[in-house]
């Protein structure tokens, strides 16, 4: 069963890890020189998979993520609705997860 709280906390743990970095070249969670890399969409893909929304990680991109997330049960909302922690925000070229600072010291 999918668990948004698990996906959310996985994202926070990764963002707080000093051995995680940003790379589009190594975006599929590859570890190079002791640093594990993601880009914005591959991090969302990893966290959604960890949370049980996806059976295996497709390493989606911002261009392809819409279909994967809708298929996993996520729903689109309008920009004027209040954001909740764990909501995934998307625009052309970037995605991120809404973060509540009371839940830890990192950013998503």
Predicted regions, residues:
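Intrinsically disordered/low-complexity terminal segments and short unstructured peptides
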Residues: 60-61, 77, 107
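Catalytic Cys-His active-site segments of thiol-dependent hydrolases/isopeptidases
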Residues: 97-108
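A short, compositionally biased micro-patch
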Residues: 89-92, 101
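Loop/turn positions that initiate beta-strands
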Residues: 85-87
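Membrane-embedded alpha-helical bundles of multi-pass integral membrane proteins
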Residues: 62-66
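N-terminal capping segments
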Residues: 1-57, 92-94
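Short alpha-helix capping/helix-loop boundary micro-motifs
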Residues: 71-80
């Amino acid at each position: 069963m999918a668990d948004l709280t698990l996906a959310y906390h996985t994202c926070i743990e990764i963002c707080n890890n000093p051995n995680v970095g940003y790379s589009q070249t190594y975006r599929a969670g590859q570890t190079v020189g002791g640093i594990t890399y993601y880009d914005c969409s591959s991090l969302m893909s990893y966290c959604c998979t960890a949370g049980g929304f996806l059976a295996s990680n497709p390493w989606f991109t911002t261009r392809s993520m819409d279909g994967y997330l809708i298929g996993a049960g996520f729903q689109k909302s309008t920009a004027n609705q209040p954001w909740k922690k764990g909501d995934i925000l998307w625009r052309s070229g970037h995605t991120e997860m809404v973060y509540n600072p009371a839940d830890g010291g990192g950013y998503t």
